[in-house]
């Protein structure tokens, strides 16, 4: 059974020859470039490290590393696709504060500030990100937007995709499908309904989150109209993506919608069911009616009480399964939702165990989680909870993937 077959078995609730393993198939399942560079050097791989996602300084995971770690998945998004078709040395070379030399996409624009920080500029030359001196990530900087009221008239979600992006994705999808056996996940034009508070269009939160949450309660008609426009726009983009890549992808990331905190959901489940769920249902219905894709949702935090609503709305796959959050224990999730939704993640806690534990503690933790999530027939893909951070000991990363491979085989025997 090859990787693509293995993943398809798992997401269709059939028993694979081993539990599939993911690293970097979507942006929130990857690895910071600093620890990635350490890991691949221990493998004897000395190639330049490319940055796939600038804000988070996420590495572009190379094919040799994917194979060495027994990874079954591979991403399809415009950032990774463009990089895959380009030699690293054509990128923008820059040293991170730790001294590591990496390559950013050629169009990346930085500006160093007098205080030693870096700011990130968009195509118009406006600052939209800042990394403090000696920092590891860029933070979004939108103080003027956050201080203004939401104006629904100005909310104009992007409803088209450039020919250049579609052409890049089409070529890369064909290349990945024909020259690898890995399962391909598409990512782009995903919705953010729980966190939607916009002065202009994008799939990232702008303006005031608390104002948007209040609108969901007291300005329901306006909020619904905005979400209708959002879903309409996303469907138009997904239609273009599907025309470009078709069935080369088995799933598409339709939503990056962080709906929980460490302790609870961001709103009452009843409000979610009334205001948010219908829009998810319409989007999922379009995907399932017009494509063969599985619907992939990324949502961090304690989201236990939203999961049944997402299942009813048509979400097929849930990531990152933040097991360290309240009510998100593997046993509870499998007892209540096993066989109803694919859990993609939850394999290793990245808040405490992976960065702070010993390799042996990591191994025991990974074995326990796999034994629970893989206790049914299919329905599970191993992935750590969200991205592996820069301060994680590389020995722990090795322990996690070694144990995952060994134990993912064992539980399927």
Language model feature labels by segment:
Residues 1-40, 45-51, 131-132, 140-413:
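Active-site loop segments of alpha/beta catalytic cores
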Residues 21, 66, 74, 110, ...:
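Generic structural hydrophobic/aromatic packing signal, biased to beta-strands
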Residues 36-84:
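Segments that shape or occlude catalytic/ligand-binding pockets
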Residues 64-68, 100-101, 110-111, 175-179:
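Short, charge-rich binding segments
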Residues 75-90, 188-193:
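Short, glycine/charge-rich beta-strand/loop segments that flank catalytic centers
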Residues 89-116, 260-262, 266-267, 319-322, ...:
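Repeat-unit-sized solenoid/scaffold elements
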Residues 93-169:
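A gly/proline- and charged-residue-enriched helix-loop-helix capping module
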């Amino acid at each position: 059974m090859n990787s693509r077959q293995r993943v398809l078995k798992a997401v269709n609730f059939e028993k694979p020859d081993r539990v599939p393993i993911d690293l970097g198939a979507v942006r929130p399942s990857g690895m910071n470039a600093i620890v990635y560079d350490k890991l691949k050097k221990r493998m004897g791989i000395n190639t330049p490290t490319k940055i796939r996602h600038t804000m988070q300084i996420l590495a572009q995971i190379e094919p040799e590393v994917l194979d060495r770690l027994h990874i079954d998945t591979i991403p399809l998004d415009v950032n990774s696709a463009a990089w895959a078709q380009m030699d690293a040395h054509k990128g923008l070379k820059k040293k991170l504060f730790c001294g590591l030399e990496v390559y950013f996409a050629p169009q990346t624009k930085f500006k160093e500030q007098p205080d030693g920080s870096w700011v990130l500029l968009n195509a118009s030359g406006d600052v939209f990100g800042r990394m403090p001196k000696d920092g590891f990530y860029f933070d979004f900087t939108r103080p003027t937007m956050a201080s203004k009221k939401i104006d629904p008239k100005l909310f104009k979600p992007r409803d088209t995709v450039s020919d250049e992006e579609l052409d890049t994705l089409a070529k890369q999808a064909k290349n990945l499908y024909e020259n690898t056996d890995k399962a391909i996940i598409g990512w782009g034009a995903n919705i953010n309904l729980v966190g939607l508070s916009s002065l202009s269009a994008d799939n990232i939160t702008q303006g005031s989150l608390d104002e948007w949450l209040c609108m969901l309660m007291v300005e329901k008609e306006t909020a619904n109209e905005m979400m209708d426009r959002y879903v309409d726009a996303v469907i138009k983009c997904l239609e273009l993506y599907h025309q470009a890549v078709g069935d080369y992808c088995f799933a598409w990331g339709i939503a990056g919608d962080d709906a929980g905190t460490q302790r609870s959901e961001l709103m009452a489940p009843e409000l979610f069911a009334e205001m948010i769920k219908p829009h998810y249902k319409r989007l999922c219905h379009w995907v399932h009616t017009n494509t063969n894709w599985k619907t992939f949702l990324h949502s961090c935090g304690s989201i236990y009480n939203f999961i049944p609503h997402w299942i009813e709305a048509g979400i097929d796959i849930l990531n990152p399964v933040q097991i360290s959050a309240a009510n998100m224990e593997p046993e509870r999730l499998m007892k209540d939702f096993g066989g109803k939704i694919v859990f993609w993640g939850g394999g290793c806690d990245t808040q405490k165990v992976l960065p702070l534990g010993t390799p042996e503690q990591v191994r025991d933790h990974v074995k326990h989680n796999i034994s629970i999530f893989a206790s049914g027939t299919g329905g599970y893909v191993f992935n750590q909870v969200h991205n592996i951070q820069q301060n994680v000991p590389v020995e722990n990363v090795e322990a996690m993937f070694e144990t995952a491979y060994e134990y993912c085989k064992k539980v399927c025997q």
